[in-house]
């Protein structure tokens, strides 16, 4: 396949799959029903990381990370349909968290070692 899909196009693919005239299986899924899929795909991504270390098979890891992204997108789409939140909210939240927990990069904090970073991370997490 030569076409390169964007994040926006991928988001639309997920919407289409869950649309009334989309895929029956995808339409039936709920947060709860997708738990086994989320767990399986997360484990397969971990396996893909280990395989990359052993064999340098980047294609496998790329595919497995795509499967994890699919899970995130499916849960976000379901949440959007339920009026809870959107993928944009997920991205906003994680972006704010990364900026907040890295004051040594995005603020006035300092960190001279990984240990200092982890200490700051835990302190901020407690707030």
Predicted ranges, named:
Residues 1-64, 70-127:
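Flexible "arm" and connector segments at domain edges
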């Amino acid at each position: 396949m030569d076409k390169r899909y964007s994040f926006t196009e991928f988001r639309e693919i997920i919407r289409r799959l869950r649309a009334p005239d989309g895929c029956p299986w995808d339409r039936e899924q709920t947060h709860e029903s997708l738990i086994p899929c989320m767990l399986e795909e997360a484990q397969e991504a971990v396996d893909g990381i280990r395989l990359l270390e052993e064999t340098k098979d980047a294609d496998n890891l790329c595919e497995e990370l795509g499967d994890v992204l699919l899970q995130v997108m499916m849960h976000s789409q379901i949440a959007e349909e339920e009026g809870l939140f959107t993928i944009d909210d997920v991205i906003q939240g994680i972006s704010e968290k990364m900026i907040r927990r890295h004051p040594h990069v995005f603020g006035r904090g300092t960190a001279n070692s990984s240990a200092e970073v982890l200490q700051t991370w835990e302190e901020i997490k407690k707030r």
